[in-house]
């Protein structure tokens, strides 16, 4: 990482061990970057390239003692080619209207978030998030963050929170209408972000971490090609083989 200001002032510490939120039978630790007020968009972009991610004002990366399951992944958008199911999802939802909104609380957004968590992640803890926890998670940011809502007519179908980096976009979180069981909103959301990257001439869409053992993350390896940060370098990954990020 660069050594000039403000990079030289960034400090890192390791958290105490805690139960892994992805693999419940494992113990995790995180490496946290501080102080938060110095982590602006240029600094955060460099941190993301080094495997970090953020949750609200908390910038971290996995720092586990005996596990390397978390692989930071990104899509090189120039090389991406959608498969048949992705083309179908794009066509199915072509009438969705995307609107950028202020990074501010909306009762309508929170209601959709609650429905999504209760349906897709029941019992995971986030389904119990109150308004304050929701706001801390998605509406607090020290970088260039966009909140985009997707509507079908007047009906809110999906919300995406996206960070703009110096070399791409980082998909922070997306939640959508869980009652439309035939829909492919999550796939469409990623395809939409890929198109935004291309339009802005940004080379990468960062998708956070991929864990081979986590079924909830299988969707990420359906986007080809996919690069992972493995042993300190970004390269194309083989989902059947790769898993260690360091």
From Swiss-Prot:
Enzyme Commission identifier(s): 2.3.2.29
Acyltransferase in keyword set: yes
Coiled coil: none
Pfam families xref list: ATE_C, ATE_N
Endpoints of the signal sequence: none
Cellular component GO terms held in the UniProt record: cytoplasm
GO biological process, one term: ubiquitin-dependent protein catabolic process via the N-end rule pathway
Catalysed transformations (reactions): N-terminal L-glutamyl-[protein] + L-leucyl-tRNA(Leu) = N-terminal L-leucyl-L-glutamyl-[protein] + tRNA(Leu) + H(+); N-terminal L-aspartyl-[protein] + L-leucyl-tRNA(Leu) = N-terminal L-leucyl-L-aspartyl-[protein] + tRNA(Leu) + H(+)
One function term, GO molecular function aspect: leucyl-tRNA--protein transferase activity
This protein's record includes keyword GTP-binding: no
Primary localization class, coarse: cytoplasm
Keywords, comma-separated and alphabetical: Acyltransferase, Cytoplasm, Transferase
Compartment(s): Cytoplasm
Family as reported in the entry's similarity comment: Belongs to the R-transferase family. Bpt subfamily.
Role noted for this protein: Functions in the N-end rule pathway of protein degradation where it conjugates Leu from its aminoacyl-tRNA to the N-termini of proteins containing an N-terminal aspartate or glutamate.
NCBIfam families to which the protein is assigned, alphabetical: PRK01305.1-1, PRK01305.1-3, PRK01305.2-3
Full protein name: Aspartate/glutamate leucyltransferase
Species, as recorded: Aromatoleum aromaticum (strain DSM 19018 / LMG 30748 / EbN1) (Azoarcus sp. (strain EbN1))
Primary gene name: bpt
């Amino acid at each position: 990482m660069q050594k000039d200001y403000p990079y030289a002032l960034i400090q890192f510490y390791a958290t105490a061990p805690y139960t892994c939120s992805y693999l419940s039978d494992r113990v995790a630790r995180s490496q946290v970057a501080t102080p938060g007020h110095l982590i602006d968009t240029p600094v955060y972009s460099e941190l993301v390239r080094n495997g970090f991610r953020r949750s609200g004002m908390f910038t971290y990366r996995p720092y586990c003692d005996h596990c390397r399951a978390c692989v930071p992944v990104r899509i090189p958008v120039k090389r991406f080619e959608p498969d048949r199911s992705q083309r179908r999802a794009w066509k199915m939802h072509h009438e969705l209207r995307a609107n950028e909104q202020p990074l501010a609380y909306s009762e309508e957004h929170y209601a959709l978030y609650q429905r999504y968590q209760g349906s897709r992640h029941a019992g995971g803890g986030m389904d119990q998030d109150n308004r304050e926890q929701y706001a801390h998670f998605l509406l607090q940011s020290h970088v260039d963050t966009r909140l985009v809502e997707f509507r079908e007519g007047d009906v809110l179908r999906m919300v995406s929170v996206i960070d703009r980096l110096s070399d791409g976009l980082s998909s922070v979180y997306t939640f959508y209408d869980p009652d439309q069981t035939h829909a492919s909103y999550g796939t469409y959301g990623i395809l939409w972000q890929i198109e935004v990257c291309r339009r802005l001439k940004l080379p990468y869409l960062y998708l956070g971490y991929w864990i081979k053992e986590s079924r909830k993350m299988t969707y990420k390896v359906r986007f080809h090609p996919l690069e992972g940060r493995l042993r300190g370098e970004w390269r194309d990954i083989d989902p059947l083989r790769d898993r260690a990020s360091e």
